[in-house]
């Protein structure tokens, strides 16, 4: 079979020797076809060139030796040689001294070196017949010439043997007449190199036809003898050339350079044997036939034949007649071969190490599994998973709903029948992982101790009495009933007042597990209710994740920023929360992933929001709202001293250093730098102050300077936090006619709001009103109502005053970049119009708020606490509130109401008496 692999379609001449293991295999296969017999090494004498039937001795790849006859008369060998070298086997044989004309045999890939046996395949019948005739006449000698390459090296062509040989064959056939045709006037020998090798045909073996046209082929064994030069063409069919036999240039065998180069070639060949042991047989044969390595010309040819260089480099060695130059060229090729061999060995070793390491680990793991399985210590993955799920589920079976028990049992049965490699196996495994991990009926211990809860809440937060009272009420009910139920508490207030942090304190006070997630910007319903299991990477919703994370069915869950829910093409999360936050429905909450009811009725939900306007009505209806107002200055001072200052010093590394802020500086820091309703900005400023103190302390330590305690006073604030961004809320110390102080509140807290009114032009029919200041539709309507009401009210108070009928008025609300809207400015705008019309200023240090109807009724408004705090911060002494807000004002603590006079009115006539009917 290996011999048949040597036969190629459309090949005229092919060298079968190659520098690789595969090429040696082909050579051995060919020799087997020729009838080479293996004999014992001890039973074979050394080859000698003087005998007619001298034997050529060579060592085969399997360790045996074969004999090849190379007599003077050209008799064929009874056994051929196998080669493990690049170009064949080096031999010593007798040969005639002169042949001026020889039959030319083209070699497509590698030149034949003297002393080397090379198998060659020919397919031309005429050439085969001529060679057989020459052998019968005892003149079986030819000239072997390497074909000239066209555009690419033979080494690259060897990678595409079929295409490259086809091209060479076409040129050879056209030149030497293997197909009976030739180019007019062209010398076919021009396609071959001028320097070749005088070779003896050792044997010719006919091979069976392997081409579509039934052509036969033959394989030659060529033994190279010496170099020759092609002088010209004598005959074209077949190609016979005139040659000149060449001899090596004379050299001094005792020359130091030649000796050194020879020794280096020998050493390099030994190095090559370490990386490529396939050359070892050739070297052993060479040592046996040439006594030692002190024959430089033969050593150079041997070394070149062992190299896998391209045809141009090997042809250069063949053409060198200078022994010194030939040794140098061979040494260069051998050095390259050694480096390539080392690189191949390194790559092979790395690959073998990796493969052997992986295989060893695999075998050990398999053995370990087998041992454990025999001992009953381990089962396969599927069995282990089923046991794990069963072990996890059995203790909870009695507390799990019957419907869920049925689903889990079915899924376990389904898992046992699935192959671990199937995709459904992973889906079922993940589903069971979630089902068996949930805390079915497992409730955490909670502390229903009012005193403990009060202590924890007061330790973490200052104020927030409404929230604290609600939690204490929740605990009290739980004490009396002996059990607690889930509730939905929503805390609404400006940023920085402690809504989120109070949720953690509630969990600590109750002794429950705490879980927080934010729904701000959430637009995917799957975040709440989970994904369908059919989707890749499906997961349950946040609430199911919460139960698995906490491991109990009664945690405190903080849903942050519920007023900022989004809405997109994935659905409406606000609508999904309806089921979650409904105490009547969340006992059987259905997650899309689990698809079994889950009891959330024992969960205490705490939601946070800045405003209620953006929360859908049906969702808001399910919540218990607790409002958190902003802090006044005194409260902020207490919070700063009790909580923020200590934390800021600790973060700055000043826990052991004496650095304090005076009370005056703290009040100024709050009043001029941190006027927001919460204390988050105050916390940032305190951290900034103590960071600068830390810088001073660090610099003092670096210079071994003792730093005195640092006291930060009012005058030092500029150095620590810069210039104050706020000066005062009051634009006017004394309001002129037409200017009134109003009160407003937003999600950021309360603030004072000035209403300014002035006349533009007067005359008959000019009684119009213009409004500016980015007023919303509701506020514009309030202005129109106020203008209409003021006309009638002015006539009742001052019948002869026709100012409003004849004057165009302009109402403006300062801070024009800030949008403003709401109905609570009605009484303020009316008072501003009356003040201008009557040319009478409003009572000093007075502010008001309230919605005015067209008939003069004053309706209640919201944000009483925030507005009261804003009025006090601005230095207001008297506040006019609607009568309907008296209950809200009475609920305020004494420290907020201290120093304020509140006037409650139900009609505008009462507003007029408090604001305009006063003596200057």
From Swiss-Prot:
The lineage of its organism: Eukaryota, Viridiplantae, Chlorophyta, Mamiellophyceae, Mamiellales. GO terms for biological process: cellular response to oxidative stress; chaperone-mediated protein complex assembly; mitochondrion organization; oxidation-dependent protein catabolic process; protein quality control for misfolded or incompletely synthesized proteins. ATP-dependent serine protease that mediates the selective degradation of misfolded, unassembled or oxidatively damaged polypeptides as well as certain short-lived regulatory proteins in the mitochondrial matrix. May also have a chaperone function in the assembly of inner membrane protein complexes. Participates in the regulation of mitochondrial gene expression and in the maintenance of the integrity of the mitochondrial genome. Binds to mitochondrial DNA in a site-specific manner. Keywords: ATP-binding, DNA-binding, Hydrolase, Mitochondrion, Nucleotide-binding, Protease, Serine protease, Transit peptide. SUPFAM superfamilies: P-loop containing nucleoside triphosphate hydrolases (SSF52540), PUA domain-like (SSF88697), Ribosomal protein S5 domain 2-like (SSF54211). It is found in: Mitochondrion matrix. InterPro entries: AAA+_ATPase, ATPase_AAA_core, Lon_bac/euk-typ, Lon_lid, Lon_proteolytic, Lon_Prtase, Lon_prtase_N, Lon_prtase_N_sf. Belongs to the peptidase S16 family. Homohexamer or homoheptamer. Organized in a ring with a central cavity. It comes from Ostreococcus tauri. GO terms for molecular function: ATP binding; ATP hydrolysis activity; ATP-dependent peptidase activity; sequence-specific DNA binding; serine-type endopeptidase activity; single-stranded DNA binding. This is Lon protease homolog, mitochondrial.
């Amino acid at each position: 079979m290996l011999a048949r692999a040597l036969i190629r379609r459309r090949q005229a001449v092919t060298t079968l020797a190659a520098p690789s293991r595969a090429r040696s295999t082909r050579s051995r296969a060919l020799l087997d076809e020729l009838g080479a017999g293996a004999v014992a090494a001890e039973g074979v004498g050394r080859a000698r060139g003087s005998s007619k039937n001298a034997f050529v001795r060579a060592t085969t790849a399997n360790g045996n030796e074969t004999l090849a006859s190379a007599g003077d008369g050209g008799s064929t060998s009874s056994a051929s040689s196998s080669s493990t070298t690049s170009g064949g086997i080096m031999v010593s044989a007798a040969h005639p001294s002169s042949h001026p004309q020889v039959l030319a045999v083209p070699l497509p890939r590698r030149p034949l070196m003297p002393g080397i046996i090379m198998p060659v395949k020919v397919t031309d019948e005429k050439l085969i017949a001529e060679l057989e005739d020459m052998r019968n006449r005892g003149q079986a000698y030819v000239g072997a010439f390497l074909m000239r390459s066209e555009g690419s090296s033979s080494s690259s062509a060897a990678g595409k043997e079929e295409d490259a040989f086809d091209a060479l064959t076409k040129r050879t056939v056209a030149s030497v007449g293997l197909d009976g045709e030739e180019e007019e006037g062209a010398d076919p020998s021009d396609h071959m190199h001028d320097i070749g090798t005088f070779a003896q045909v050792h044997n010719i073996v006919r091979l069976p036809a392997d081409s579509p046209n039934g052509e036969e082929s033959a394989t030659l064994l060529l033994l190279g003898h010496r170099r020759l030069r092609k002088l010209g063409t004598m005959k074209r069919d077949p190609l016979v050339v005139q040659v000149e036999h060449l001899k090596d240039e004379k050299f001094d065998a005792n020359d130091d350079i030649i000796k050194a180069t020879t020794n280096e070639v020998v050493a390099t060949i030994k190095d090559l044997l370490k990386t490529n042991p396939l050359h070892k047989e050739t070297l052993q044969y060479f040592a046996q036939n040439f006594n030692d390595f002190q024959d430089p010309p033969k050593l150079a040819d041997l070394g070149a034949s062992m190299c896998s260089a391209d045809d141009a480099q090997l042809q250069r060695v063949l053409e060198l007649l200078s022994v010194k130059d030939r040794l140098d060229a061979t040494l260069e090729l051998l050095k390259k071969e050694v480096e390539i061999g080392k690189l191949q060995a390194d790559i092979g070793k790395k690959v073998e190490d990796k493969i052997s390491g992986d295989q060893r680990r695999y075998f050990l793991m398999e053995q370990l599994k087998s041992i454990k399985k025999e001992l009953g210590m381990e089962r396969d993955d599927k069995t282990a998973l089923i046991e794990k799920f069963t072990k996890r589920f059995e203790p909870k079976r009695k507390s799990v709903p019957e419907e869920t028990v049925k689903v889990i049992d079915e899924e376990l049965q389904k898992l046992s029948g699935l192959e671990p490699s199937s995709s459904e196996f992973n889906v079922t495994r993940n589903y069971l992982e979630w089902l068996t991990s949930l805390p079915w009926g497992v409730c955490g211990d909670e502390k229903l101790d009012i005193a403990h809860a009060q202590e924890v809440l007061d330790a973490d937060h200052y104020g927030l009495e409404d929230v604290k009272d609600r939690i204490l009420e929740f605990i009290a009910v739980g004490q009396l009933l002996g059990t607690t139920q889930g509730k939905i508490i929503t805390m609404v207030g400006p940023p920085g007042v402690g809504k989120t942090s109070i949720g953690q304190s509630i969990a600590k006070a109750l002794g429950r597990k705490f879980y927080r997630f934010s729904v701000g910007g959430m637009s995917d319903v799957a975040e709440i209710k989970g994904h369908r299991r059919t989707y890749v990477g499906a997961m349950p919703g946040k609430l199911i994740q919460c139960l698995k994370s906490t491991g109990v069915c009664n945690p405190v869950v903080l849903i942050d920023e519920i007023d900022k829910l989004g809405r997109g093409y994935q659905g409406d999360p606000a609508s999904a929360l309806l089921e979650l936050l409904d105490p009547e429905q969340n006992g059987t909450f259905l997650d899309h992933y689990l698809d079994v009811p889950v009891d959330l009725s024992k969960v205490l939900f705490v939601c946070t929001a800045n405003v209620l306007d953006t929360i859908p009505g049906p969702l808001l209806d399910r919540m218990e709202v607790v409002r958190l107002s902003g802090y006044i200055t005194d409260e902020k001072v207490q919070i700063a001293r009790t909580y923020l200052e200590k934390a800021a010093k600790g973060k700055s590394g000043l826990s052991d250093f004496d650095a304090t802020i005076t009370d005056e500086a703290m009040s100024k820091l709050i009043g001029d730098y941190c006027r927001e309703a919460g204390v988050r900005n105050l916390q940032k400023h305190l951290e900034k102050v103590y960071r600068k103190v830390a810088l001073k302390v660090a610099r003092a330590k670096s210079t071994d300077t003792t730093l005195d305690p640092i006291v930060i006073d009012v005058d030092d604030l500029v150095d620590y936090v810069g210039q104050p961004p706020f000066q005062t809320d009051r634009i006017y110390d004394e309001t002129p006619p037409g200017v009134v102080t109003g009160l407003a509140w937003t999600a950021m807290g309360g603030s004072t709001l000035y209403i300014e009114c002035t006349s533009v032009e007067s005359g008959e029919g000019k009684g119009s009103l213009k409004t500016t200041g980015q007023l919303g539709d509701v506020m514009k309507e309030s202005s129109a109502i106020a203008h209409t009401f003021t006309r009638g009210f002015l006539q009742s108070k001052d019948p002869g005053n026709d100012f409003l009928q004849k004057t165009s008025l302009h109402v403006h609300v300062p801070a024009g970049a800030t949008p403003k809207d709401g109905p609570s400015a009605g009484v303020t705008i009316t008072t501003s119009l009356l003040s201008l019309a009557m040319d009478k200023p409003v009572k000093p240090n007075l502010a008001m708020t309230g919605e005015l109807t067209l008939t003069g009724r004053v309706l209640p408004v919201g944000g009483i606490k925030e507005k009261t705090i804003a009025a006090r911060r601005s230095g207001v002494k008297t506040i006019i509130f609607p009568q309907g807000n008296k209950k809200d004002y009475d609920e305020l603590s004494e420290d907020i109401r201290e120093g304020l006079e509140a006037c409650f009115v139900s009609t505008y006539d009462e507003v007029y008496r408090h604001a305009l009917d006063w003596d200057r």
